[in-house]
Structures are given as structure tokens and as C-alpha cells.
Amino acid sequence: MSRLRLLLSDSHDPLFNLAVEECIFRQMDPNQRVLFLWRNANTVVIGRAQNPWKECNTRRMEEDGVTLARRSSGGGAVFHDLGNSCFTFMAGKPEYDKSVSTAIVLDALTRLGVEAFASGRNDLLVATPDGERKVSGSAYRETHDRGFHHGTLLLDADLGRLANYLNPDPKKLAAKGISSVRSRVANLCELLPGIDHPQVSEALQEAFFSHYGERVQPEHISPEQMPDLPGFAETFARQRSWEWNFGHAPAFSHQLDERFGWGGVELHFDVEKGVIGRAQIFSDSLDPAPLDALAARLPGTAYRADALYDLLRQWRSEFAAREAELEELSRWLLAALR
């Protein structure tokens, strides 16, 4: 058996690619050195300990069809599109060493004609007339006997969209969890016009082979060519689930307020594991009974619009005399939780 393994994904589905990565990592021979190359279409990828409602503009993401994906490693939130090239290096311990994989990526960039250097927060930077700019970010994961280093290279990413989706709505969130630190970034196409994913992929493969003094044939993976990985279907289902991508968020509090013609409303939610644990509703409405009833029903409900839709419809039906007012409040609340 070769000590190297090279896998290339033909899928742009981030949930598929992250599930493949997870299965390979769990099942790899610890004596092998693995390189997995992939790309994702429009996606915000958040770190394992992050709160998507705090990190992301979830409303704009839904409107624009942008996927949210939680990865198993730490670190901050990043936006992926097809202008990013993604890489994952895996190895067993004690050979796993992220400085080795970083050196391989730097060698690949040198082969392409870009002189980059490693910086403190897991980034690769280049010097430009405007100062140092980030062209690659990484995150890491280790278990008792293996580890991986994965990251992205910015080729021709839409940096404006990155800023749009990584800025949350002005919601009043008091959240626990890890916040992303924004960095000044640059695309490699600014330094190498015409650079594309196949060129970067080829350079990474050559640097990988050169470092280990061995070559292997790539294994191509796609949804049409499902990977022969035990447990993949279950891992893929988990990666796609709301419970993992949203429900795994750290505990946080959310405050919403709005003034309607019939009175002002202020809602306070405590949310844990994506479920409303406590709800308080304050109002100067002349008839607060419907709001008291709603506050009593909200605990135990998933913190998402589709889960609240049926609850709100049933609640309104019990206060038919105020149907128009409660419909107005329901529309506002559902829009706020998107």
C-alpha cells in the first residue's frame, strides 16, 4: 500500500465535500498521508464552536440561496465560492505536523510564481503595494492518533459577497461562542491574472508528491461516483441536518422589538442547541393576554421560521378577535428569524 493518497472532488456541494472529508479522516490508515482537493459553490462555512446567527447574515443567505455549513474544525467563518480552492492534508501521529502541510502550500504557490509567507493566525500572506494581504486561511483538527489541516486559497473570489454574508443582521444578539476576526484579503488573480483551480490543484499535487518523494493516481469523487466509505450516508445526513449546522450553536440570547399601531412589543429569547429555552414578551398593548399565551408556548420550539409557522397559526386561531393584529406580529417575527 502506498503511503500517499490523493482524492479529488468533482462536487461543488459543501455538505457533500465536508462529509467526504469527515469519513476519510475517521477511516484513513494512520500511516498514510492524504491530500484532498475540492471546491464549494456559494457557502458560508462556520467553525465548530460558532453561532451562525451571530456570524452570518442568515436572512440574506436564504434570499440568495447561499448554503450554511458547519465544519468539524475550529476557527472563524469564511465565504466560499468557485473562486476558492480548498485543500485538506491528513496524517497520523506523530507524523502529523501542520508546519509540513503549510510548507507544501507555500511550495505550490512558489511553483505558480507567488511568494507568500505564513502569519500568526493560521494565514498565508503576500506583500502588495497596499500592504500585506491574506490569500489563504486554515483551520485544524486533531484526535488522539491523527490530525488534519484544511484551508482555502483565494483565486478569484467575490470579496464583496464575502463581506455581505459575514456581517450579521443588526439583531440584538448577546451570544457565547467564537467570533470571527476579519482580515484584509486579496485574490491571487491580482498577482497572477488568469489563475484557475486546475492550475492551483496541479501545483498542490506536485508539491505534495515532491515533499514525500512518491506519486499516486488520484481518486475522483462525486455524487455520481459515491465514495466507497463505510458510514458515508449517515455522515452526509448529519452534515446536511439543521441540528448540526444551526442547532450545534452555543447558547445565546436574542432580543427583538417592534412598534405596531396597536402597541410596542419586545421579545427576549434564550436559545440553547437551536431550541428556545425561555421566552419573555413585554408590551404596552391594552390586551396582553395573547402575548402571554405566546410566551408560554415558545419554549421547546426550534429557533427557525418553519418550526414557528404552525405554532403561530394555531396561536392566532385562539384569539380570532385580534386576528389582523396577531397576523401582523407573526409576519414580523417569522421574517426576523430567517
From Swiss-Prot:
One of its GO terms (biological process) is protein modification process. (R)-lipoate binds at residue 134. GO terms for molecular function: ATP binding; lipoate-protein ligase activity; lipoyltransferase activity. CDD domains: LplA. ATP binds at residues 71, 76-79, 134. Its EC number is 6.3.1.20. Pfam families: Lip_prot_lig_C, LplA-B_cat. It is found in: Cytoplasm. Monomer. Catalyzes both the ATP-dependent activation of exogenously supplied lipoate to lipoyl-AMP and the transfer of the activated lipoyl onto the lipoyl domains of lipoate-dependent enzymes. HAMAP family: LplA. In the transfer reaction, the free carboxyl group of lipoic acid is attached via an amide linkage to the epsilon-amino group of a specific lysine residue of lipoyl domains of lipoate-dependent enzymes. This is Lipoate-protein ligase A. It comes from Aeromonas hydrophila subsp. hydrophila (strain ATCC 7966 / DSM 30187 / BCRC 13018 / CCUG 14551 / JCM 1027 / KCTC 2358 / NCIMB 9240 / NCTC 8049).
